[in-house]
């Protein structure tokens, strides 16, 4: 089960174990995009490693990509095994069996710096240090979201607009860093466009700083008259020395770590406010995106930044790209299985395969 997503949705692990635990010997949680949930107290129910489990519960495996938002070199990852509560039962997987299964797929010439990075990461988080690092980081990112909500009108963070009868940005930062109400997907809420989930099932990962740009009426699922494609904002930020993690049709993502300082985040906010001012002033594209303008001057000669946004937005709108993208992930639009993936893998290993162009697949 994928515990957390790239874009910042995270499961309630306790709820998963309560719902399906009795059906499983073990549950494997893929926590590649998280791994720090046990160091943020309000996220304790999202951490499979912090659950109190008994002999009737499943064993737990958790894998984490330490290199993403923790202190690890590229490719550094780790696997955790939590199953002392079922030791002695037939389903229990001993430590040596796990190690031998792992070694069957591991290199005998590993890069030892990766192991050193794991040790450094563990030491950094030892005792109360890990909690202090991450809770302070959460507060920093909360303040950044508040600044955007108060100062921007085209760009907003993906958070509930109102919590407990008060605007999100009017909440007390100390409380918000310790209360999952400010990060919850409540059933029936319309601000995010998701459907088909239960109370307490999903939360926003506070360390995935995602901004939504104008252009899509999320509550009604339709396009607005004007919009700012995420790619335009991403290129503007790169022009100004800020590298986003990724962008999509109408959003942009930053992965936050304890290394983020108030100074760095204030710089991001200032750049976003400046971008909106350039949109309102309909500044020349050559001023806002000089590198792209220079590379394609024949195409964009005389363009303004608002004109570019409108042209790209209309392209998406006329083709209903937002709906097409959403359909990619719906069951009714998935391709029909001709053969199951395991059987296909065996046939591939036997050489019974052919490389074809994507349009023929």
Language-model features: locations:
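Conserved PLP-enzyme active-site core in the AAT-like
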Residues: 1-152
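Non-catalytic terminal extensions of PLP-dependent enzymes
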Residues: 128-361
């Amino acid at each position: 089960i994928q515990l957390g997503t790239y874009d910042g949705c995270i499961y309630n692990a306790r709820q998963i174990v309560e719902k399906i635990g009795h059906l499983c010997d073990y549950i494997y949680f893929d926590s590649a995009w998280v791994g720090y949930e046990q160091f943020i107290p309000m996220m304790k129910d999202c951490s499979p490693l912090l659950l109190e489990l008994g002999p009737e519960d499943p064993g737990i495996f958790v894998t984490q990509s330490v290199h993403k938002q923790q202190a690890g070199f590229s490719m550094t990852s780790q696997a955790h095994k939590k199953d002392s509560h079922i030791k002695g039962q037939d389903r229990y997987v001993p430590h040596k069996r796990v190690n031998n299964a792992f070694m069957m797929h591991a290199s005998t010439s590993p890069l030892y710096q990766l192991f050193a990075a794991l040790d450094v990461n563990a030491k950094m988080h030892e005792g109360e240090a890990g909690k202090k690092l991450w809770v302070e980081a959460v507060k920093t990112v909360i303040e950044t979201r508040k600044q955007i909500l108060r100062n921007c009108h085209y760009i907003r963070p993906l958070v509930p607009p109102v919590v407990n009868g008060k605007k999100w940005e009017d909440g007390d930062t100390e409380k918000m860093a310790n209360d999952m109400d400010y990060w919850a997907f409540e059933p029936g809420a319309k601000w995010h466009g998701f459907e088909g989930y239960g109370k307490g099932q999903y939360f926003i990962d506070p360390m995935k700083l995602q901004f939504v740009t104008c252009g899509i009426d999320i509550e009604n699922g339709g396009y607005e008259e004007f919009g700012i494609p995420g790619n335009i904002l991403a290129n503007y930020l790169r022009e100004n020395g800020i590298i986003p993690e990724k962008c999509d049709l109408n959003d942009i993502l930053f992965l936050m770590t304890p290394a983020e300082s108030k100074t760095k985040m204030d710089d991001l906010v200032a750049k976003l406010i400046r971008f909106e001012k350039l949109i309102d002033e309909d500044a020349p594209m050559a001023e806002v995106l000089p590198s792209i303008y220079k590379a394609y001057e024949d195409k964009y000669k005389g363009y303004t930044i608002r004109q570019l946004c409108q042209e790209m937005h209309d392209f998406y709108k006329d083709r209903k790209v937002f709906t097409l993208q959403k359909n990619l992930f719906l069951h009714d639009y998935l391709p029909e299985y001709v053969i199951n993936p395991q059987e296909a893998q065996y046939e591939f290993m036997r050489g019974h395969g052919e490389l074809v162009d994507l349009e023929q697949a």
